[in-house]
């Protein structure tokens, strides 16, 4: 499989290296970036061509798959171009920045008549996540009742905004909760330290003195699924000590924890093996005309969760997740 990697930033360059060094049955044929110098730097030692547009990449002989790793607001148009050529697509999260654009992408894929888009929620490929998923499905400890999640990051960049706690971080918990439970999320509530009128009930958490000006950090997110499973997420993006993601599953007859104490400098180190497994699964499935992980529907559903999460963050109130009817293609 000859892959065009779109975007030569941190994630794109990492995927170029991964495809070149670690993935079987795939090669990097082209790297696309509007900054040609950055694209050329990413191609060094791979034999791939550096180009400035996806149209140029498709003109490269043999290109028959696309990996999208640009900023999220650029994903939609790239997805349409790739769908028009009916090639396998691995799109980093978010699939698109909002539910409306994500639904348009779903409709475009439905019109194509088969699934071509795999969305890059890499945690599903982590060994710990897969082990916990297997235990939930086996049911040896009874039904899953609750999930307690923590998502901690060492620090944020200067341009970080409060909605990014949801859109960039809790988005992974939205996906993980859907992955573990096999259910859609129905509501989200975010509890922060805010000034509110008495009639609005918001639990006020203590704000870290190290949080950037204007951002309440950490925050607490309460999530409910279709069958009533409750999940809570501690999101703390300026924890300073490192990157740590942990999940505790509460069953009728037992408790299982993953991730606690696995502290790394960033998500890249923590989920390096998961990224490798994700891309290999995509390649293996694509060679058989299939996808090997989260679908465009999953990308749409998590976008809807994020919209509800940001609305709940602003209001402090329980907010419903609104989803369109699930197309037959994804059932």
Swiss-Prot record:
Xref: Gene3D superfamilies: Dihydrodipicolinate Reductase, domain 2, NAD(P)-binding Rossmann-like Domain
Identify one Pfam family in the record.
Answer: GFO_IDH_MocA_C3
Does Oxidoreductase show up as a keyword for this record? yes
Can you provide one Gene Ontology molecular function annotated for this UniProt record? inositol 2-dehydrogenase (NAD+) activity
Stored InterPro entries: Gfo-Idh-MocA_inositol_DH (IPR050424), Gfo/Idh/MocA-like_OxRdtase_C (IPR004104), Gfo/Idh/MocA-like_OxRdtase_N (IPR000683), GFO_IDH_MocA-like_dom (IPR055170), MI/DCI_dehydrogenase (IPR023794), NAD(P)-bd_dom_sf (IPR036291)
List UniProt keywords, sorted A-Z: NAD, Oxidoreductase
Which family does this protein fall into?
Answer: Belongs to the Gfo/Idh/MocA family.
Give the function comment from the record. Involved in the oxidation of myo-inositol (MI) to 2-keto-myo-inositol (2KMI or 2-inosose).
What is this protein identified as?
Answer: Inositol 2-dehydrogenase
């Amino acid at each position: 499989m000859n892959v065009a990697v779109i975007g030569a930033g941190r994630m794109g360059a990492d995927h170029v290296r991964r495809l070149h060094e670690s993935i079987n049955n795939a090669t990097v044929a082209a790297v696309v970036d509007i900054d040609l110098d950055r694209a050329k730097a990413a191609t060094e030692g791979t034999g791939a061509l550096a180009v400035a547009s996806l149209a140029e990449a498709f003109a490269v002989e043999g290109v028959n798959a696309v990996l999208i790793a640009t900023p999220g607001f650029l994903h939609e148009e790239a997805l349409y171009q790739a769908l028009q050529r009916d090639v396998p697509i691995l799109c980093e999260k978010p699939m698109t920045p909002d539910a409306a654009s994500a639904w348009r992408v779903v409709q475009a894929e439905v019109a194509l008549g088969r699934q071509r888009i795999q969305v890059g929620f890499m945690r599903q490929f982590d060994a710990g996540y897969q082990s916990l998923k297997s235990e939930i499905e086996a049911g040896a400890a009874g039904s899953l009742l609750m999930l307690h999640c923590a998502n901690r990051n060492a620090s944020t960049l200067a341009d970080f905004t409060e909605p990014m706690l949801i859109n960039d971080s809790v988005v992974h918990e939205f996906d993980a909760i859907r992955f573990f439970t096999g259910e859609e999320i129905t509501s989200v509530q975010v509890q922060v330290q805010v000034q509110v009128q008495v009639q609005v009930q918001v639990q006020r958490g203590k704000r870290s003195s190290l949080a950037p000006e204007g951002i309440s950090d950490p925050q607490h997110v309460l999530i409910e699924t279709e069958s009533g499973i409750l999940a809570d997420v501690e999101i703390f993006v300026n924890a300073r000590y490192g990157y740590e993601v942990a999940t505790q599953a509460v069953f009728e007859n037992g408790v299982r924890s993953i991730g606690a104490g696995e502290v790394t400098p960033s998500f890249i180190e923590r989920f390096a093996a998961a990224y490798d497994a994700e891309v290999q699964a995509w390649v293996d499935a694509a060679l058989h005309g299939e996808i090997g992980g989260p679908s465009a529907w999953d990308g749409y559903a998590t976008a809807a969760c994020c919209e509800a999460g940001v609305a709940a963050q602003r209001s402090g109130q329980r907010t419903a997740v609104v989803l369109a009817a699930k197309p037959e293609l994804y059932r």
